[in-house]
Swiss-Prot record:
Organism encoding this protein: Ehrlichia chaffeensis (strain ATCC CRL-10679 / Arkansas)
GO molecular function, one term: 1-deoxy-D-xylulose-5-phosphate reductoisomerase activity
Protein name as annotated: 1-deoxy-D-xylulose 5-phosphate reductoisomerase
EC number, UniProt record: 1.1.1.267
Positions of transmembrane segments: none
Region forming the signal peptide: none
GO annotation (BP), single: isopentenyl diphosphate biosynthetic process, methylerythritol 4-phosphate pathway involved in terpenoid biosynthetic process
Domain of life: Bacteria
Names of the cofactor(s): Mg(2+); Mn(2+)
Protein's job: Catalyzes the NADPH-dependent rearrangement and reduction of 1-deoxy-D-xylulose-5-phosphate (DXP) to 2-C-methyl-D-erythritol 4-phosphate (MEP).
Pathway noted in the entry: Isoprenoid biosynthesis; isopentenyl diphosphate biosynthesis via DXP pathway; isopentenyl diphosphate from 1-deoxy-D-xylulose 5-phosphate: step 1/6
Binding site for 1-deoxy-D-xylulose 5-phosphate: 123, 149-150, 173, 196, 209, 214-215, 218
InterPro entries the UniProt entry points to: DXP_reductoisomerase (IPR003821), DXP_reductoisomerase_C (IPR013644), DXP_reductoisomerase_N (IPR013512), DXPR_C (IPR026877), DXPR_C_sf (IPR036169), NAD(P)-bd_dom_sf (IPR036291)
């Protein structure tokens, strides 16, 4: 029986792994579920899969969660102390699905705990942690297996052939605004941006997909995760989301990774790694794929897609990656709370990148400081807009 910890269990990815585990409960023992504030769903999940412990990040919700679990043997913790406890448990596998920069410190704790496998559904911890985080994982002999469909696809392809690479291409669905013209995009609402045509995702990543800054973050993630030069990375719009990544070699051959667009497939891969297990999901039927479309990204309509490449051209990639991520998180939050318009998101990110000139990143504290400075500048930029 595989022992499992799930961080961010009430989010979109967290709910999917809960479904997978519930369908095969005799194979998994869930040691802890961690969530930010959704106590009702967290309590339901814990009872459903008989989790040993739960942690709620918001300490004000501790008693409510405890009351919901009266009559069970499930242990309840909250806040930072609960997070430290959760990351120190002896488990075979941890799913890191906390959204945004908030995942970085728990990721560091997990790696230091000596866990063997972390399934990473959080690109921001790699974008911001960079080589510091990955070097720590290597030192501790921790295997980080990416959950993002594109990076999971690249990971699987490169597991058989890493030599003589010419290019790695990440595909992008194009998001919910792909078919709109620029004038339409100027006036989109929050509801327009969170309705992704292909993937089931949370609000933040749905907005990132709409601005295509998500793809910029993924380019930086690939740069770090696969130790590949920026000039060997590319993006292609592929609305059907059947091909998730393409690895091209110097001999003219390319290997494409294909599956139906279902995040349960890469999640199951990480759960079974280094083996493979069957999963109840729709399988790819090539005969039903009437066409596969590929479109060059339109950087005029979606300027956010080029920011990752621009960051990778700078002399201080690590700091600028942190600045990009921090400004984006602040701007997306402002958009979701209807404080700014959709096109303001990229404007705020660009202004923050121009204004913040941070020094060398050489420690976790410098990462956190750069993040904090960038958030303040981004917030100030937003305040000046209206």
């Amino acid at each position: 029986m595989k022992t499992v910890s799930i961080f961010g269990s009430t989010g979109a990815i967290g709910q999917m792994i809960i479904d997978i585990i519930f369908a095969d409960l005799d194979k998994y023992q869930v040691k802890v579920l961690v969530a930010k504030s959704n106590v009702q769903l967290l309590a339901f999940q814990a009872k459903l899969i008989n989790a040993e412990r739960v942690v709620i990040a918001n300490v004000d919700l501790y008693q409510e969660l405890k009351d919901l679990l009266v009559g069970t043997n499930i242990k309840v913790s909250a806040g930072d102390s609960g997070m430290v406890m959760a990351t120190s448990l002896d488990v075979d596998y941890a799913m890191m699905a906390i959204v945004g920069m908030a995942a970085l410190i728990p990721m560091t704790y997990l790696i230091n705990s000596g866990i063997k496998v972390i399934a990473l559904a959080n690109k921001e911890s790699i974008v911001c942690g960079g080589t510091l985080l990955l070097s720590l994982a290597k030192e501790k002999n921790v295997n980080i297996v990416p959950v993002d469909s594109e990076h999971n696809a690249i990971y699987q392809i490169l597991s058989s052939s890493k030599k003589n690479l010419e290019k790695i291409t990440l595909t992008a669905s194009g998001g919910p605004l792909l078919s709109m013209d620029y004038d339409q995009i100027k006036n989109v609402t929050v509801q327009d941006t969170v309705k992704h045509p292909i993937w089931k995702m949370g609000k933040k990543i749905s907005v990132d997909s709409a601005t295509m800054i998500n793809k910029s973050l993924e380019i930086i993630e690939a740069y770090y995760f696969f130790s590949i030069k920026a000039e060997k990375l590319d993006i292609i719009i592929h609305p059907e989301s059947i091909i998730h990544a393409i690895v091209s070699y110097v001999d003219g051959a390319s290997i494409a990774f294909m599956s139906v667009p279902d995040m349960k497939i890469p999640i199951m891969y990480t759960l079974s790694w280094p083996d493979r297990s069957a999963i109840l999901c729709k399988k790819l039927n090539l005969a039903s794929c009437n066409q596969l479309t590929f479109i060059k990204p339109d950087v005029y309509k979606f300027p956010g897609i080029k920011l990752g490449f621009e960051v990778l051209k700078t002399s201080n990639v690590h700091a600028n990656s942190i600045i990009l991520n921090a400004a984006n998180e602040v701007a997306v939050d402002a958009f979701l709370n209807k404080k700014i318009r959709f096109l303001d998101i990229v404007s705020v990110v660009c202004e923050t990148l121009n204004l913040v000139n941070y020094g060398r990143i050489n420690s976790l504290s410098s990462i956190l400081d750069c993040d904090l400075v960038s958030r303040r500048v981004a917030s100030s930029a937003i305040d000046k807009l209206y």
